[in-house]
Amino acid sequence: MSRIGKRPIPIPDKVAVTIDGSTVKVKGPKGELSQVLPPEVVVVQENSSLLVNRRDDSRPARQRHGLSRTLVANMVKGVTEGFRKNMQIVGVGYRLQVTGNKLAITAGYSHPVEIDLPKGISVEVDQKAVPIANSKSQQGFNFGVIGIDKQAVGDVAALIRAVRPLEPYKGKGIRYATETLRLKAGKTGKK
């Protein structure tokens, strides 16, 4: 049995869970999420917790057991606390600006790159420059991608990072806050 799949999911008081066949809907103070689970698993609500069980011990059921439990647990956490992906933008003149549901990124191109933010996702930008780890002279800006759907938050963060990935010589670009970069040595020149 899956070690992750057999753990019960606690349901906080503010959260309402509706199970309709293979569809699980979770409603909480931050919003509402729904997920269609694979037919190999079944979700059962007992008192103030959810249990994800397999229908049988077939290989597909074993493979999807832990995944299904994690998806439901992330939905419960998302509607109560939400998810945040912390990021940094480093480089001279590199900026972020949020207007409505559009994010304009100025990252060394001749034009700002605009990204449409999906519904339920927001970007919070800290306008104060902070020193960057592993660098003596560089400063950057911290920002965070916030939402209730963990997958959507990760997708938008990856989309933003892809605008200007880190370059290994000066360390400029957009990075996750937890990402580390080993700078490469540049050319040594003629002697």
From Swiss-Prot:
Pfam families recorded: Ribosomal_L6 (PF00347)
Keyword Ribonucleoprotein: yes
One term of GO molecular function: structural constituent of ribosome
Gene Ontology biological-process annotations: cytoplasmic translation
Keyword tags: Ribonucleoprotein, Ribosomal protein, RNA-binding, rRNA-binding
Top-level division of the source organism's lineage: Bacteria
Family note: Belongs to the universal ribosomal protein uL6 family.
PANTHER family named in the record: 60S/50S RIBOSOMAL PROTEIN L6/L9, LARGE RIBOSOMAL SUBUNIT PROTEIN UL6M
Subunit structure, interactors included: Part of the 50S ribosomal subunit.
Protein name per its UniProtKB record: Large ribosomal subunit protein uL6
Organism: Cyanothece sp. (strain PCC 7425 / ATCC 29141)
Highest classification ranks of the organism: Bacteria, Bacillati, Cyanobacteriota, Cyanophyceae, Gomontiellales
Gene behind this protein: rplF
